[in-house]
Amino acid sequence: MKKKIALIFGITGQDGSYLAEFLLKKKYEVHGVKRKSSSLNTERIDHIYEKDKSLFHLHYGDLTDAISINRLINFIKPDEIYNLAAQSHVAVSFIIPNYTANVDAIGCLNILEGIKSSGLLKKIKYYQAGTSEMFGKVTEIPQTERTSFYPRSPYGVSKVFSHWMTINYRESYKMFACNGILFNHESPRRGETFVTRKITLGLAKIKLGMQKKLVLGNIYAKRDWGHAKDFVEAQWLILQQKKPDDYVIATGKQYSVKYFVNLVAKELKIKIKWKGKGFNEKAYNENNRVIIECNKKYFRPSEVDSLLGNPYKARKLLKWKPKTSINELAKEMVQEDLKILSANDKKKR
């Protein structure tokens, strides 16, 4: 039986690395696209390359360069394309909105056009990574596939463009093109500037005496958090269906940033006590020293206060459900950060 070939844009990211591992276990031939940059930025996938050199291939490319995308599609001739590449940091999207739109919106269009013009339209299945940030200022709780979009950031707006463009190409050209509307999903591979990883790494450093204080933004923001490893399975399942469609991928459970902080502190055996209200609320340790506080510079120009997904459709049609609880997720992230920090400390000695 011929091996299936997958092409992953965003291979060096959190989702890209987990998806590559998942597909290799299913005996896929996996091709990943990475941008040429001054740093290698392959730490999330180095272990995969060492283990599966014959089935794992890396290529240089860029979503903003239609020529490179066309070349890759025609050269690799994939069965499945996963577009996980993005400028995905919401706060950063306000600073570089033009770049965010070029990558997150026009990048998707470049892939869709590449598939259309490749002569492989009937062969290729396409997955577009959407985000709960498209719902933004939510019009209903929980959010489903039918909930109206109200994005509150250049990132969210760009992803709405990609979502509808994917549907447009599906309906106009009979392309097998699908959207996954993924709610927050975390892991030890999450970037250090994202709030969950910022919390686990920051509190781990405080525990080890490497840092005195953790500064956060809106600790009352509520999110639906799952594990990236669980979510990439859903991405694959979406492309295994008989008909292309769009799915909300979420846990259906919601927690505040403050709740996640408390979970991590408990895992690290750091006793904290919250004092104050609103923006002035702070967490104190046993010695009555402030170790967590808020700063307005980490607030967004337009906040998204509450996101909660309804994964009913995914459960029913994909037979998918998340395996990792918020407690298990926090524990895994904390343990990995402690391991990384300890290893780095030994190297310095």
Where are these regions (language model features)?
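C-terminal substrate-binding subdomain of Rossmann-fold SDR/epimerase-dehydratase oxidoreductases
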Residues: 19, 25, 32-33, 40, ...
